[in-house]
Curated annotation (Swiss-Prot):
Pathology linked to this chain's protein: Ichthyosis, congenital, autosomal recessive 14: A form of autosomal recessive congenital ichthyosis, a disorder of keratinization with abnormal differentiation and desquamation of the epidermis, resulting in abnormal skin scaling over the whole body. The main skin phenotypes are lamellar ichthyosis (LI) and non-bullous congenital ichthyosiform erythroderma (NCIE), although phenotypic overlap within the same patient or among patients from the same family can occur.
Effect of residue 347 to A: No change in subcellular localization
Source organism per UniProt: Homo sapiens
Gene name in the database record: SULT2B1
Biased composition (Acidic residues): 309-325
Protein name per its UniProtKB record: Sulfotransferase 2B1
Length: 365
């Protein structure tokens, strides 16, 4: 099966990159609300989100990757791009990730790009209540990737320190309070995952977790291939797995977001693909923060099915053979924070093959 064709319109993405550079100089680090959900000013607008919600431009062979921010978006994009090309890495090595899987809701979004070839691969962080309405009467497919929300908090906190469009996260305690109240970009993690899980059981919806990919990447890739109706032979499958490890993505300038201007993503202050691990929250949460999170989680997720991160919160998955080489020097949400972490048992995180995050705006998140 043929995957999407590479660059369709001469000069389109050159113009796009110019737009990004101009926009990135004007990011105020403030939020506006669309139907109650917070969005960063600059990369999003009322008009761009309304277009994503109300467009009729949905094709039956469209593939949507849906995540809450910092839940594995980059990883899933890389995997699906490789699947669509039957393991051939030339596409992921030559075309920026935001061009391969443009965002639905950014001001230069997937639905505003002309003449895209099928099948289209698109990304979104939108909660289900404002996602593209036309999808729900189509045969288009959604892959929703979840992640331990404790790891999401840590990753989003660090990302907020380098992303020009986001508010300064403040202290670790303040950021955790904001996260638990849904006062962060794209709103409540709890509402996001609970909303999308209403789709579970439908033929065009796949729910998979970061932790499942970490524990069994090859098996997870085979599951995704089955969902997409794109089975791969042994050699192609091995290539998908090999080229979607954390180290492979971190070394790929088309996937690690280092092509973005510092005003949008300041890599001098930290890497977008930071560690690529599961369980890193144990190196950052204080006991008090962990207890506060657990209380909110139990209340919000009562009646929901068990997730991989619920089975034993003190146990991590098996280690990845290619862990990130960069150790975190001080255990806290932020280095040198005044919040000292009390000792926790079994607090060593296990490396994972890839960390996602996120961007047709090359909005990494």
């Amino acid at each position: 099966m043929d995957g999407p064709a590479e660059p369709q319109i001469p000069g389109l993405w050159d113009t796009y990159e110019d737009d990004i550079s101009e926009i990135s100089q004007k990011l105020p680090g403030e939020y506006f609300r669309y139907k109650g959900v917070p969005f960063p000013v600059g990369l999003y607008s009322l008009e761009s989100i309304s277009l994503a919600e109300n467009t009729q431009d949905v094709r039956d062979d469209d593939i949507f990757i849906i995540t809450y921010p910092k839940s594995g978006t980059t990883w899933m994009i890389e995997i699906i791009c490789l699947i669509l090309k039957e393991g051939d890495p030339s596409w992921i090595r030559s075309v920026p990730i935001w061009e391969r899987a443009p965002w639905c809701e950014t001001i230069v979004g997937a639905f505003s790009l002309p003449d895209q070839y099928s099948p289209r691969l698109m990304s979104s962080h939108l909660p289900i209540q404002i996602f593209t309405k036309a999808f729900f009467s189509s045969k288009a497919k959604v892959i929703y990737m979840g992640r331990n929300p404790r790891d999401v908090v840590v990753s989003l906190y660090h990302y907020s320190k380098i992303a020009g469009q986001l508010k300064d996260p403040g202290t670790p305690d303040q950021f955790l309070r904001d996260f638990l109240k849904g006062e962060v970009q794209f709103g409540s993690w709890f509402d996001h995952i609970k909303g999308w899980l209403r789709m579970k059981g439908k033929d065009n919806f796949l729910f998979i977790t970061y932790e499942e990919l970490q524990q069994d990447l090859q098996g997870s890739v085979e599951r995704i291939c089955g969902f997409l109706g794109r089975p791969l032979g042994k050699e192609a499958l091995g290539s998908v797995v090999a080229h979607s490890t954390f180290s492979a993505m971190k070394a790929n300038t088309m996937s690690n977001y280092t092509l973005l201007p510092p005003s949008l993503l300041d890599h001098r202050r930290g890497a977008f693909l930071r560690k690529g691990v599961c369980g890193d929250w144990k190196n950052h949460f204080t006991v008090a923060q962990s207890e506060a999170f657990d209380r909110a989680y139990r209340k919000q997720m009562r009646g929901m099915p068990t997730f991989p991160w619920d089975e034993d919160p003190e146990e991590d998955g098996s280690p990845d053979p290619e862990p990130s080489p960069e150790p975190e020097p001080k255990p806290s949400l932020e280095p040198n924070t005044s919040l000292e972490r009390e000792p926790r048992p079994n607090s060593s995180p296990s490396p994972s093959p890839g960390q996602a995050s996120e961007t047709p705006h090359p909005r990494p998140s």
